[in-house]
């Protein structure tokens, strides 16, 4: 997981990808990469002027696309956080290297408390309407990526 864009730079993001790839090659311990964008709007660190604004959507898209390339053969699953970037953003990330849209969630409040406005949960039907227009199959999976 890379929670990014509160205080670090793109150079730090790249360094993170390189280091986690090396760690994955040694341990095989990661099942996915989740590039969580910093939601700044109501975040205390942002309101105290101790952080930058959250990333632009372009930065978010590029981090996920570069992660797909950087982790090739090491980490197979790249997850988009729909609760942080919304349905439209998630669709775009699915076209830029992501293959996972995460979970349904129930009463999600961490991102909402920070200012995100993309909802507290999604139904399986909502996920289907998100991925099917892209010609992508919707699959239920376990935490370790076994499909059901």
Q: Where are the regions that the model predicts?
A:
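Glycine-rich anion-binding loops and their surrounding alpha/beta cores
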Residues: 19
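Aromatic-lined glycan-binding groove of carbohydrate-active enzymes
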Residues: 13, 22-24
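Aromatic/hydrophobic pocket-lining residues that form the small-molecule binding cavity
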Residues: 13-16, 60
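Canonical radical SAM enzyme core domain
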Residues: 5-13
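Auxiliary Fe-S-binding modules of radical SAM enzymes
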Residues: 24-148
